[in-house]
Amino acid sequence: MSARRRVPNKPAPKNAPRLHQPGQAVLKAILPEQIDWKPFPAFPPSARLAVVVGQPLQEGPYTIRVKVPGGVKLMPHRHPEDRVYTVISGIFYIGLGDKFDAEKLHAYPPGSVIILPGNTSHFHWAKSGEYITQVTAMGPLGLEYLSAKDDPRNNC
């Protein structure tokens, strides 16, 4: 008979980042029609971002959703934080590298989970139509394009 390891039932450290804040209801649910899609200055104008949980621009855990319409490319960029992408809908095309190269794209269908280490240069393309991904990470969220000409924040 194998010995069972017990998981200790200890409270989280008092200074641990929390998603559930004091004073919030015990359960919080967000229905698809309640997702608040907004433009995000670091994305192409037609792409949208929605904050699901947390405060991405501050330290601590966050979850966002990203919606990119068909044909739109996010040129090579990187994020300082490690990220976990979950494909919600559409086909998510992501490639690694400092230059956009369609040959390096990998296609991930809904339900796929992609783990991307921080500071990894990568690019996206909504090659076959709109996609939605959910991104979970520890903030603050950062996004740096490898070429200033690709950064939509410079085209204002």
Residue ranges of each PLM-predicted region?
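Extracellular/periplasmic catalytic domains that process cell-envelope and extracellular macromolecules
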Residues: F43-P45, P56-Q58, R78-H79, T86, ...
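Glycine- and acidic-residue-biased ligand/ion/polar-headgroup-sensing regions
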Residues: P69-V72, R78-K99
